Amino acid sequence: VTMAPVVQLWRRARRTGQLPDPARLAEARQLVGIRHLTLEPRQHRRLRAGLTRPGMRIDFGGIAKGYAAQEALAQLSGLGVSRALVAIGGDISVGQPPPGESGWRVDVAPLDGAKGKPELRLSLREAAVSTSGDAMQAVVIDGIRYSHIVDPRTGVGLEGQRSVTVVASLGATADVLATTLCILGPDRGIALIDQLGKTDRRLAARYVDTDRQVVSKGWSAHLAASGRPPAAVVTP
């Protein structure tokens, strides 16, 4: 969440078609890191966040939509609405399925994000799904394709094209893990999902790029056959 100074430089790069200035990028990277973020307990189980360096900013891009969908679903449940689907961009949270259905049908868009051409279909109940990728937000500079997803280890936008879809019990979990897998890559990313899946039975993921597709152990349990139109489409 402290990546905002670096992310801002890459947003400008997508607008101008020019790579971030190396000196400014180096300065921005000095403002990144959880060590520069303080959390102070407050009343009612709340925390007060503090930024210890001038120029620091917070960016919730890797978790906000998933969390918002999760909380919206919780609010509906609190009002007695148990059968619901909340979609915010590429992040979806679902409750109990529609009457007579085993789950909510959610289509996953292909790597290039093409509309009307779903690559596969999921069936979900009381779960969340998030897709992270760069089909819609990338820039090509000097023949290299840079994603809007920035690797915090290097401060550089990910190169190439990829799409990660994660199913989890909670929207925030699905959202943050989808972004994390984009950065870690298929081997380390899917290994992480398989490990975490031991404590979240719904957790599963699919990583696809221009060369290959890798899925976690529990992925196939969420697949659905084609049939009636989907309730939503999750896009990168």
List the predicted regions and their residue ranges.
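Mature catalytic core of soluble alpha/beta enzymes
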Residues: 1-236
